[in-house]
Amino acid sequence: AGRDAMIFPTMWSPFKIASFTYVFSGSSDEKFMRHCKEDPDSVSAGVQAIADTLEDWAEGFLDAGADGLYYSGQFSEPGRFSQKEWETLVMPSDLQILNRVHARKEKYNIVHICGEAEHNFTASPERYKKYPGDLFNWDVHRDHFTLEQGREYFGKPVLGGLDNHGILIHGSAEDIAGETRRIIGSFGKKGLMIGADCTVPADIDVNRLRAAVMAAREV
């Protein structure tokens, strides 16, 4: 990794990539979900094959000098799966990859808990308590799970606080700086990495992000 910044490649979960094989071949997420319910064993076999490949991919990232993974945990949106279904279908492949990183000395897992647009960007952070994450990130504005709650629940540092559908996009630089100061003032500096709740647009004005960075440095 570089001297000035740590490197965390993004990796989507095997389950999400399995869904992509449907969507990008002209099928749909709805059909994938139907197959998960009707024939979970076949879906699990396919997801396992993807997980085995991604596990090797993750190892390659680490060997090349990455400091860990920014891992996008998926499919915990309310209404997709029951807790039992999720633990059977989704969780094992997540843990396969995250445990591989966790076993490496001085390598770290950033666990991003992602909700998709068709589910109003909501997810279920409470399902990730047993994940070997070193830093946790979720949508505090839509999951109704605050940074303070996350710090206590996970017992780990947390990332986020800035609404990637709100102030980061529509606010002024002064608004963003003010919100950054408010978050840090409320939460404190310990165990917090200020950031967005989820992905920001690729064409975002970098000065918006800079406003948050500079405000955080000044607190």
Protein language model annotation of sequence segments:
Residues 1-219:
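Active-site loop segments of alpha/beta catalytic cores
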